[in-house]
A protein has these predicted regions:
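N-terminal leader/targeting segments
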Residues: 6-8
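Cyclophilin-like peptidyl-prolyl cis-trans isomerases
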Residues: 2-3, 12-192
């Protein structure tokens, strides 16, 4: 009986440890992106049903299923776009920005796509994931995550997700910190 109790106790500890490290089993059905950065992990819920084009672009670049043009060589690539890029623009009490292969704010994937503004998705608080752009319909690969509500960006930038875990990491990010890797997590039949 004692051995069984110890075994059960050990199993519970291992399951708790796995849950603390991975945490993925607690996620509801949906599509998520896990950003592993040089400062820690950020888990984002992606709004794939409300802004499918924007989410598909981000996921395709993250998973190397979407081709992009290297801004230095000019060659087409199908590699994990975000891995190893830096947060090239960080403004305290506003946002962190990444997704530029040049690290200057002027780079992208070699193409642009239309804005996808959903009326229910607003820059309503900290942790909002949105597309950075250079004006209407100039989306590519650059994104930002807010530190606070930024309502003046509504209707100008496509919101496509939110931080559900790791806001403390967002708040620690400094200019030049790295996106080590981006992993996409799918839960449920609708998360394609």
């Amino acid at each position: 009986m004692i051995i069984r109790a110890r075994g059960f106790f050990l199993l519970m500890i291992l399951l708790s440890f796995q849950h603390a490290i991975f945490g993925a089993e607690e996620l509801k059905d949906g599509l998520y992106a896990k950003l592993e950065t040089s400062r820690g992990e950020i888990l984002l819920q992606l709004y794939h049903q409300r802004v499918p084009q924007t989410v598909a672009n981000f996921v395709g670049l993250a998973e190397a299923t979407k081709a992009w043009k290297d801004p230095i060589s000019g060659k087409s690539k199908k590699t994990r776009f975000y891995d190893g890029l830096s947060f090239h623009r960080v403004i305290a009490d506003f946002m962190i920005q990444g997704g530029d292969p040049l690290g200057t704010g002027s780079g992208g994937p070699g193409y642009r796509f239309q804005d996808e503004i959903h009326p229910d998705l607003k820059h309503s608080g900290p942790g909002i994931l949105s597309m950075a752009n250079a004006g209407p319909n100039t989306n590519g690969s650059q994104f930002f995550i807010t530190h606070k509500a930024t309502p003046w960006l509504d209707g100008k930038h496509s919101v496509f997700g939110k931080v559900i875990r790791g806001m403390e990491t967002v708040n620690k990010i400094q200019k030049g910190d790295l996106i080590q890797t981006v992993s996409i997590i799918r839960r449920g039949k609708d998360a394609k």
